[in-house]
Swiss-Prot record:
Keywords: Amino-acid biosynthesis, Arginine biosynthesis, ATP-binding, Ligase, Nucleotide-binding, Urea cycle. PROSITE patterns: ARGININOSUCCIN_SYN_1 (PS00564), ARGININOSUCCIN_SYN_2 (PS00565). L-aspartate binds at residues 118, 122-123. The gene is Ass. It catalyses: L-citrulline + L-aspartate + ATP = 2-(N(omega)-L-arginino)succinate + AMP + diphosphate + H(+). One of its GO terms (cellular component) is cytoplasm. This is Argininosuccinate synthase. L-citrulline binds at residues 86, 91, 122, 126, 179, 188, 270, 282. ATP binds at residues 9-17, 35, 114-122. The lineage of its organism: Eukaryota, Metazoa, Ecdysozoa, Arthropoda, Hexapoda. GO terms for biological process: argininosuccinate metabolic process; L-arginine biosynthetic process; urea cycle.
């Protein structure tokens, strides 16, 4: 009887290497897929490792360009931020990786997908919801939810012992007391010593950014970022005079420059979809710069009520992405609505980078879209187009409900300072 084929989302690390061997012991034929989303990884070494363990095939899927153009750029366009601070670096990578996994599953006729996501985290939800949206007939193998697997592997030491027993290479490099997840948009750090929310993250944890207080340049630097319908279209390095127009190059440049100024660090406690609170430390230098520039241009370009409606949809969409619903009907609907609003968000923003922060300092709308900002109309030195006397009636109408509240319940009791 032929063996069933399993597609394993493989990283080359200890966990998924042990999962690979465990699946082989269960008489599955395993095809490993390593997704290159811009992390610093020795893919050749990981491929050799998986083949040595017994994988039938190892596929390295270079999805960096798709990740930037199809996921990160739309996230910038939509202004996605989860719980007001997290720019969704890990969440956005999961649907991108899932597409690569499903393409391999179709090519090889696999009926099973396996992953190494823990039973307490969000990634199990993200990978599996994406898989069911893209290939509904797929069956999931989640070892960290398997009773037998969890009894066999109580923790990292059990995994190390199992690896040594089966000749699986274990890194000689001491493990950091936290876990990381990296891609071209960000690096996240969690678990280990970071599980105590009162523990300050050590400085040697950070990989993408320098300490803004001690190692960042003192003098600010300026950039001009161009947007076309809400999507980043170019970045001009004013000091260097170079213009970047390719998405991968733009983000790479912003990551390096923003990282050199210590921009994009956050340390937060967030609400996982599975109901737990978790502490995460994140570095997102380039994404932080793009978010700030886009937000400034958006407020400049959009009608006030359109902007407020868009912000409601943005917050819902951020939840959808964080929770794993990128391919859901509600997410597709929200994105289409936001894209319609963003048709007016074209122009350029001048951004200043300084130690630990960035800010927009100038903006200009593209000529072909026009601008709601009317310099003549808003000027205190130019008359016409706006009748100041009309403001009296506007104020009187808005005061009606306040006066009625006072009539019914009495005047507001304003506290006074005691001598």
């Amino acid at each position: 009887m032929p063996k069933e084929t399993v597609i394993l989302a493989y990283s080359g690390g200890l966990d998924t290497s042990c999962v690979l061997k465990w699946l082989l012991d269960k008489q599955y034929e395993v095809i490993c897929v390593l997704a290159d989303v811009g992390q610093k990884e020795d893919f050749t070494a990981a491929e050799k490792k998986a083949l040595k363990i017994g994988a039938k095939k190892v596929i390295v899927a270079d999805v960096k360009q798709s990740f930037v153009e199809d996921y990160i750029w739309p996230a910038v366009q939509m202004g996605l931020v989860y719980e007001e601070r997290y720019l969704l670096g890990t969440s956005l990578a999961r649907p991108c990786i899932s597409v690569a996994l499903m393409e391999v599953a179709r090519e090889y006729g696999a009926k099973y997908l396996a992953h190494g996501a823990t039973g307490k985290g969000n990634d199990q939800v993200r990978f599996e919801l994406c898989a069911y949206a893209l290939k509904p007939d797929l069956k999931i193998i989640a070892p960290w939810r398997d009773v037998e697997f969890c009894c066999q592997f109580q923790g990292r030491q059990d995994l190390i012992a199992y690896a040594q027993q089966h000749g699986i290479e274990v890194s000689a490099k001491p493990a950091t007391p936290w876990s990381t997840d990296a891609n071209i948009l960000h690096i996240s750090y969690e678990s280990g010593i970071l599980e105590d929310p009162n523990t300050v993250a050590p400085e040697n944890l950070y990989e993408m950014t320098v300490d803004p207080l001690t190692r960042a340049p003192r003098d600010p630097v300026h950039l001009v970022i161009q947007f076309d319908r809400g999507l980043p279209s170019s970045v001009e390095d004013l000091p260097g005079g170079r213009v970047y127009t390719k998405p991968l190059e733009m983000l790479d440049f912003l990551n390096k420059l923003g990282g050199s100024y210590g921009i994009g660090r956050i340390d937060i406690v967030e609400n996982r979809f599975v109901g737990l609170k978790s502490r995460g430390v994140y570095e997102t230098p380039g994404g932080t710069i793009l978010f700030a520039a886009h937000q400034d241009l958006e407020v400049f370009a959009l009608d006030r009520e359109v902007l407020r409606t868009k912000q409601v949809l943005r917050d819902r969409m951020a939840d959808y992405v964080y929770n794993g619903f990128w391919f859901s009907p509600e997410a597709i609907y929200a994105r289409k609505c936001i894209e319609l609003a963003e048709q007016r968000v074209s122009g350029k923003v001048t951004v200043e980078l300084a130690p630990g922060y960035c800010r927009a300092i100038a903006r200009k709308a593209a000529k072909d879209v026009g601008a709601l900002y009317n310099e003549q109309l808003v000027s205190m030195d130019v008359h016409g187009g706006y009748v100041p006397q009309d403001a009296g009636g506007f104020i009187a109408i808005n005061a009606v409900r306040i006066r009625e509240h006072v009539r019914a319940f009495g005047a507001y009791d304003v506290p006074t300072k005691k001598n």
